[in-house]
Amino acid sequence: MTNSFHPIPLLVFSDSYFLLLKYPVRFAKNERNVILQGEGYFSVRKNVDSRFTVQTPHHTQIQVLGTEFNVEAYEKEDEVNTTLVSGKVQFQYDSERGKKRMDLLPGEKITYNSISGEVFVSRAAVLSDISWKEGKIILYKTPIEKALRMLSKRFNVDFVITDPALKENSFTGTFIHQRLDRILEHFRISSGLRFRYIETTDSTQEKSKIEIY
């Protein structure tokens, strides 16, 4: 095998979702390694003789034999999230005492905070976590800050909440291939919040910014 990694160029889809995946030109017989930045869904055929590893930002990685799982790992964000749909994965991360490993079971989600070093395992909202694969956004009593984070990744925008009282809101709904304005209009009708695009003269700003007030 060759050790050189072949990068897929930064893929930006029509809904502004992006993914960067790197993989060897040829895999070794006993291991398959890829490097992920962004969010990806993996379906890996079981092969006990060839370990599959997804390397993610903040010195974390996921090892699998045969499974389906979702990974959300952005270099510019503090958290790495892995949701296990089926099979079994082992999540590895750095701690003060060295490398740590945790096994996940189907239906579980692990969240690692690279700043605090804390790790949380919880029951996953699997359908919501993998809904992006089909162009869906699924919310169920989702706090507004989490909902806006989902929209931020999907549509490549930044949100600013200027009314602290709005942080008490949560939303339920399924949106299929809908424009951002339509989704925010749903939020407005159900909660009374308002939104507007913030104009800027900064030509270096990569993302649009939206005020929630």
Map each language-model feature to its residues:
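A residue-level detector for the "anchor" residue at the start of short, highly conserved motifs
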Residues: 1-14, 18-213
